[in-house]
Amino acid sequence: MVQQRHVLLITYPAQGHINPALQFAQRLLRMGIQVTLATSVYALSRMKKSSGSTPKGLTFATFSDGYDDGFRPKGVDHTEYMSSLAKQGSNTLRNVINTSADQGCPVTCLVYTLLLPWAATVARECHIPSALLWIQPVAVMDIYYYYFRGYEDDVKNNSNDPTWSIQFPGLPSMKAKDLPSFILPSSDNIYSFALPTFKKQLETLDEEERPKVLVNTFDALEPQALKAIESYNLIAIGPLTPSAFLDGKDPSETSFSGDLFQKSKDYKEWLNSRPAGSVVYVSFGSLLTLPKQQMEEIARGLLKSGRPFLWVIRAKENGEEEKEEDRLICMEELEEQGMIVPWCSQIEVLTHPSLGCFVTHCGWNSTLETLVCGVPVVAFPHWTDQGTNAKLIEDVWETGVRVVPNEDGTVESDEIKRCIETVMDDGEKGVELKRNAKKWKELAREAMQEDGSSDKNLKAFVEDAGKGYQAESN
């Protein structure tokens, strides 16, 4: 009897991990594969409270991170959280695997997102083949890989020199601002857990021969970077964005359906009332909180641009009320010129005819969505992989311009206005950016079409994973 394929998909409990994981699950479900998505108890409870529907046929499981009522960063070290996540998560993950086997639907392959190297260890103990779902550009994996293989001292000793640059295999020359923030010397210790976790991830992969790494990218987007690590089997299966905007296999799939935040209702009507290509969309993702001074500069920059805008400013979490000092000084003027919302379906905004450009933090999900939707951008990176993504946007794919901060690290209103005008105007640069954005839109869609590069790569992975399970279980 042929064993029903059952993929257990483990995702770190953050919006930027859940979204691509859900899209990956959707792809597998359409191939007739049973999928169980597991995330933390608290993250799943928040997903169920949001209005989005989840993919039909997808089953859910939870693991404990030790904070089932929600992790509160204040007063708790992130390193302590990651340690609890690894310990508690490993134990509960074993239970999920054992329960599935007892119910007659054993897990045949385990796939996990980054920051969860312990999931691969559990899979190995349970004799289940595993694969990492890398949800950043493969360029960033290349940087981490080579950083720990001979490039660390160069970065540590020279990255404070503004004239210094470095070139990793398969990548363009980069300055310090283009590198993942976690490898740069910093006084910010709140995320000191990150670099050791990435190192542990690579060490875990190195324990296997030719480990499989599924990457949320596509062959045409990062051709050299995908070949830069010979010891890994890097498999491009992206972009992991809703089907209606890509391959059309499911026209009803128009959102990610796993929001941890409640969406606003009325922004669509507002967009419908604006002229084509006129709106500036501003969003800095689900994690980043900007200083008040920077928020004021963005506000003034938007007002100076004179263009209608849709700006996502997340509401305070845990029911905290906004304090008077948090309120933007020019709020009345802002509300006259544009619209401010606490959350929205970004992919629906990016595909709206009224949209002209996206002022983005350059998180990888957002970056891919701009490419899929053919939207030029103002790149406004802050931390983690965002500087690398901004480098690729500006200098490799040439679909946007990057803001230049002042000496204090603040991006001033005039600079924001300059970048918006460069992208939105019909000058030579603006026309070129829009043309390139349209080109990448077509290439992204080609990759996900039937027998496109990513479609073929995913089918080959599924076929191979089935063989791997049979070998492990014999």
Curated annotation (Swiss-Prot):
Instruction: Spell out the subcellular localization from the entry.
Output: Plastid, Chloroplast
What does the further note read? Crocin is a yellow pigment that accumulates during fruit development. No other crocetin glucosyl esters detected in neither flowers, leaves, nor stems. No correlation between mRNA expression and pigment accumulation.
Transit peptide feature, positions: 1-45
Q: What is its main location?
A: plastid
Which keywords describe this protein according to UniProt?
Chloroplast, Glycosyltransferase, Plastid, Transferase, Transit peptide
Protein name as catalogued: Crocetin glucosyltransferase, chloroplastic
What's the family? Belongs to the UDP-glycosyltransferase family.
Q: What tissues is it present in?
A: Ubiquitous.
* Reaction equations catalysed: crocetin + UDP-alpha-D-glucose = beta-D-glucosyl crocetin + UDP; beta-D-glucosyl crocetin + UDP-alpha-D-glucose = bis(beta-D-glucosyl) crocetin + UDP; beta-D-gentiobiosyl crocetin + UDP-alpha-D-glucose = beta-D-gentiobiosyl beta-D-glucosyl crocetin + UDP
Q: Could you tell me the superkingdom of the organism this chain comes from?
A: Eukaryota
Q: What class of enzyme is it?
A: transferase
* Binding-site residues, an anthocyanidin: 17
According to its UniProt entry, the function of this protein is described as:
Glucosyltransferase acting on a broad range of substrates, including crocetin, 4-coumaric acid, caffeic acid and ferulic acid. No activity with indol-3-acetic acid, bixin and norbixin, and no formation of O-glucosides. Involved with UGT94E5 in sequential glycosylation of crocetin to crocin (bis(beta-D-gentiobiosyl) crocetin).
GO MF, any single term: quercetin 3-O-glucosyltransferase activity
EC annotation from Swiss-Prot or TrEMBL = 2.4.1.271
Instruction: List the PANTHER family hit by this protein, alphabetically.
Output: GLUCOSYL/GLUCURONOSYL TRANSFERASES, UDP-GLYCOSYLTRANSFERASE 75B1
What broad taxonomic lineage does this protein's source fall under? Eukaryota, Viridiplantae, Streptophyta, Embryophyta, Tracheophyta
Which residues act catalytically here? Answer: 17
SS bond partners: none
Annotated UDP-alpha-D-glucose binding lies at 346, 361, 364-366, 369, 385-386
> Which Pfam families has this protein been placed in?
UDPGT
Under PROSITE patterns, the record lists:
UDPGT
